[in-house]
Amino acid sequence: EMLRSLVGSEMCIRDSNWTMLTDHTIKFNKLLTPFSFLYGIGVRFRNQLFDWKILRTERYDLPIICVGNLTVGGTGKTPHTEYIIRLIKDRYRVAVLSRGYKRKTSGFLLADQRSTSKDIGDEPYQMKRKFPDILVAVDADRRRGIRNLLALPENKRPEVIVLDDAFQHRYVAPTLNILLTDCHRLYTQDKLLPAGRLREPVDGARRADVIIVTKCESCIQPIDFRIIEEDIHLSAYQELYFSRILYGELEPVFSGKAPRRTLKGLASTTEVLLVSGIASPAPLEKEIHKYTEHVTSLVFPDHHAFDRHDIQKIQTAFKRLTSTSKLIIITEKDAARLRDLPSLPMEWFSHLYCLPITVGFCMDREKQFQELIVKHIDTRIKNHPI
């Protein structure tokens, strides 16, 4: 938790400066370098125990797709996990298994329509709301979580399990390991915690079958792709893809209380209060600035648990907006935490919107990625029928 808080403070500095490091942060990172060295010794030793088979990795017959990263902070795991769900949910019985970060419960929990973000965590709650027909489960012990999913009745038992943020959970061996890295801060250019954001050394990327460089600009040039490809040093068995964020239509947080709107439909005079409690809010703010110059941003820590004091802070900022056309925009993850609070001001109901995001693949390789996923699942099921 100490490491997480140190890194969290660093990320606030990065986001507020569009990922530019300040002199203060650089000096701070240098002071933390010895701790990164010690942390690296521990992580390398743990990985060696798995490589030497002293710590046992569990293997399963059904397809298990892991979506993860080498760093703390936002690389886009949730939208990429949702992309895979959307691709395969009508073909197979799908389960998503997550740790359920910052939930108030413990152990294995299978989500249902009554589950809240406090029960299962922000991301699992968001996925269950979006895809009510799939199985969403949480358990910090992924092996136990998988055992519980496979113990379900045959007509409910998953044919495919997607592991959300489990790249470092080496007690489970995925059949397909997908590693994400932010285009603006590749893992090859980062440092170990707490001086940087790496959870483990760069050579951990060798466990990946697929590497996706995320959050690319739509105007990125072919030369940029080649530079990144050379920097990552792919192994022969690895495939490289590039993806970008796609922003959807604004959705009322309280259905029926506000009209549907689009970012493109915003008037240039519209005032927006952007409230975010995510790891990397800067790209979102940049996107909204394309449509209106009048953006006030309130940034909270990632996975922040909003309380009445936060509501008052947001309300004060909202009242300062003087335009007759004004709204509050939040992320889908923040909507999961705000929606059920009992103390929301009534006037927000007609002004509160969330901005959903999806991902698209660059260089016309979307179909190739889809075929890779489906072929992997079909081959695995054919060779290991459930």
Segments (PLM) and residue ranges:
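Phosphate/Mg2+-binding loops and adjacent switch elements
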Residues: G100-R103, G107-Q238, F242
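Residue-level signal for inorganic ion chemistry
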Residues: L38, T78, M127, D164, ...
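Walker A (P-loop) phosphate-binding motif
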Residues: N47-Q113, S218-C219, N383-I386
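Short, flexible loop segments at boundaries between secondary-structure elements
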Residues: L246-G248, F300-A305, E347-T379
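Single conserved hydrophobic/aromatic residue that forms the stacking wall/gate
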Residues: E1-D15
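Acidic beta-strand-to-loop metal/phosphate-binding motif
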Residues: K326-K333
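C-terminal accessory "lid"/substrate-recognition subdomains
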Residues: S16-T25, L186-T324, N383-I386
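A transmembrane-helix-recognition feature enriched in membrane-embedded lipid enzymes
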Residues: R14-L62, H376, H384
